[in-house]
Amino acid sequence: MIVALMGCAVGPSFEEYLTTVKSAGGTNAQDCGVGRRSESDKIALACASDALAQNRSFIAVFERRGIDSQVFASVVGNERGELWRISWDSDVTGGAGGNPWPKRRIFRTVCERAWSDAIAKCINS
C-alpha cells in the first residue's frame, strides 16, 4: 500500500498570522481592516495613519502582490509610538506549486516612525 501526502503546508497558517498580528496590537488596538490592493487599501492606510498620529494602538493588514505565493503585510502600532511590519508568505520557497510542502513564514520588522508617511514606508519596506 502506498500513501501519498500532497499539499501539506509547513508553518503558520493565515489564521495564525492574523492571531499574531492582533496579539502584537494588544486588546485595545483599533482594527483598521484588510486592504486588498484597491480602495480598501486607502481606507486601512488612512485609519492606521490617524491612529498613529493620536498614539493609539492599531493593526492594518494589506495584501501585497506575490510572484508565486500569497503575501500579506501588516502594520502594527502601539500607544508608545512603536511601529512594526509583520508579514506572512504562503510559500517562502518560491515553489509556484512545485513543492509538495510549501513553507509558510511570518516575519517581523521594526519600522521607523520618523517619516511623515511612516505607515506607507513600513508596508513597502
Regions found by a protein language model. Give the residues of each.
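Sec-dependent bacterial lipoprotein signal peptides
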Residues: 1-6
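Bacterial signal peptide processing site
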Residues: 9-10
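Mature cores of small secreted peptide/protein domains
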Residues: 13, 36-38, 52, 116-117, ...
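Acidic (Asp/Glu-rich) sequence patches and key acidic residues
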Residues: 13-34, 94-96, 122-124
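N-terminal secretory signal peptides
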Residues: 20-61
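Short beta-strand segments that buttress and anchor functional surface loops
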Residues: 59-65, 87
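Polybasic, proline/glycine-rich intrinsically disordered low-complexity segments
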Residues: 69-125
